[in-house]
């Protein structure tokens, strides 16, 4: 099976635990206003690789990855679901830690064939970094041109399967950096039993030059980048919302 790959980063340090071999998949149906990889949207082009090709390169440098592993990102890796499953299957057979960085956008429980593939994927995935773009359905649709009901359901599904979850959330002034949305996000993720980490990332405009090269208008032109202090502020609100959810769940359990 052939995978369409945009690029490979051999020394990734922000895409999962430890040093990572990071594979950027081609193709993404989301059109997030702050996307910094618009060159990955098109599912065509890039480099063609087999799972064996990628794992051979990983093996040639495996001493670097003793405390890390392989991360599939993009683009949206789930757009090449069959190839992703094959890659992770073969990686797990070699004892390699597998991490999926995804928006979960193609997940739907009501498709039995698709759900069976997701069940298989969960069996060979150690960690999922789920990027929740916006907790509010209407705002998510405006921000990413896709609904979020299936994405939030994917978070619940991952949790049901017992796979470790890291939540990622980008804060943008007047879009996601709004207290009641942050609290709502926290309340939602507070219900995830297998939540292991929360990354709150301040918006930056470093991807704007890629839009210019591709001849695409940058949706957030003029938007000011945020700071680490903004991220700390937002993270605190999210964690308070998560704590409240856990307290509410505990109270309900004690009343049963």
Question: Can you say where each PLM-predicted feature lies in the sequence?
Answer:
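N-terminal [4Fe-4S]-dependent radical SAM core
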Residues: 1-24, 29-47, 60-66
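Auxiliary Fe-S-binding modules of radical SAM enzymes
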Residues: 2-14, 171-256
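Short glycine-enriched, charge-decorated loop/helix-capping segments at active-site entrances
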Residues: 39-43, 141-147, 215-224
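Short cysteine/histidine-rich metal-coordination sites, predominantly Zn2+-binding motifs
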Residues: 46-56
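Conserved AdoMet/S-adenosylmethionine-binding subsite of the radical SAM
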Residues: 55, 59-69, 78-201, 206
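Active-site beta-strand/loop signature of hydrolases that rely on acidic residues for catalysis
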Residues: 75
């Amino acid at each position: 099976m052939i995978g369409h790959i945009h690029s490979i980063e051999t020394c990734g340090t922000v895409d999962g635990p430890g040093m990572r071999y990071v594979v950027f998949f081609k193709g993404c149906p989301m059109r997030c206003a702050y996307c910094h990889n618009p060159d990955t949207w098109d599912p065509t082009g890039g480099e063609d690789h087999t799972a064996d090709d990628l794992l051979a390169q990983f093996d040639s440098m495996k001493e670097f990855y003793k405390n890390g592993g392989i991360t599939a990102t993009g683009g949206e890796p789930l757009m090449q679901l069959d190839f992703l499953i094959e890659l992770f299957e073969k990686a797990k057979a070699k004892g390699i830690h597998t991490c999926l960085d995804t928006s979960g956008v193609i997940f739907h429980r009501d498709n039995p064939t698709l759900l069976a593939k997701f069940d298989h994927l969960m069996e060979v995935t150690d960690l999922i970094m789920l990027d929740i773009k916006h907790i509010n359905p209407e705002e998510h649709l405006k921000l990413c041109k896709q609904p979020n009901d299936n994405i939030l359901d994917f978070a619940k599904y991952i949790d049901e399967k017992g796979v470790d979850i890291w939540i990622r959330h980008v804060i943008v002034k007047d879009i996601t950096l709004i207290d009641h949305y942050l609290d709502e996000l926290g309340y939602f993720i507070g219900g995830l039993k297998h939540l292991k980490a929360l990354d709150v990332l301040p918006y930056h405009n470093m991807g704007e030059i890629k839009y210019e090269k591709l001849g695409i208008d940058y949706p957030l032109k003029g938007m000011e980048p945020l700071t680490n202090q903004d991220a700390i502020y937002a993270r605190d609100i999210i964690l308070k919302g998560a704590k409240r959810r856990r307290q509410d769940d505990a109270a309900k359990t004690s009343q049963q």
